[in-house]
Amino acid sequence: MDAIKKKMLAMKMEKENAIDRAEQMEQKVRDVEETKNKLEEEFNNLQKKFSNLQNDFDTANEGLTEAQTKLEASEKHVAELESDTAGLNRRIQLLEEDLERSEERLQSATEKLEEASKAADESERGRKVLESRSLADDERLDGLEAQLKEAKYIAEDAERKYDEAARKLAITEVDLERAEARLEAAEAKIIELEEELKVVGNNMKSLEISEQEASQREDSYEETIRDLTQRLKDAENRATEAERTVSKLQKEVDRLEDELLAEKERYKSISDELDSTFAELAGY
């Protein structure tokens, strides 16, 4: 009877130990599953962060491309403005040269007119002197008449030259007025172009600053990408290690579940044996 009681006590203690071990196994399984879930969640978060950073880098690249396009357009516009300015300067130079030539021709015509007028006056004075000295001297009179005719011809030619010079002078004055008007318009256009060039210059400075900032951001993004790439590699390595750990833990879980099942079967066997023993005792 004492032996049976000792056996029952031993079986009861073994049953309690089996229950404790089973509970410990179940807790260990829960801990392993929780660790596995945390690792999977961390891996998913790393994948999301890398995707977001990749999107930010694409956006930065698009902004850099747009800034480069604007800079090229501004440089093209500046080149066109410089070409237009050079053309206007050339036209102004040609107008100034034409004006100088017109002034030289006018000066020459004025000098010739003065010479013709002096010659006509001198001839007229000579004719009067000759007429007063000798009205009977036909030869001298004929000579004087010839000189007078020549003087008149010279005077008429001078008048024609004067009229031609006056006409050319009037045309030159009109051309000069037109040239001055074109010159004023050209100067106004040059001022306007200079203002536009200043604006374009300021825009180019802004674009250069934006380009430098974009370059700095690009360098920063490249550094960030390199860092993220390294972090991704580290995360992949950690994920790979985590997968290996999870695999090991899964194997451990399977082993613990097998042990738990064995303990449950053993517990059931002990319970059945206790029930049988109690039944035998009840029969006594």
Curated annotation (Swiss-Prot):
Pfam families from the UniProt entry: Tropomyosin (PF00261)
Keywords: Coiled coil, Repeat
Gene3D superfamilies reported for this sequence: 1.20.5.170, 1.20.5.340
Keyword NADP belongs to the record: no
Keyword Repeat: yes
Recorded coiled-coil stretches: 1-284
Stretches for region Disordered: 103-131
Source taxon at top rank: Eukaryota
Family: Belongs to the tropomyosin family.
Domain notes for this protein: The molecule is in a coiled coil structure that is formed by 2 polypeptide chains. The sequence exhibits a prominent seven-residues periodicity.
Function field: Tropomyosin, in association with the troponin complex, plays a central role in the calcium dependent regulation of muscle contraction.
Record note on quaternary structure: Homodimer.
Protein's name according to its UniProt entry: Tropomyosin-2
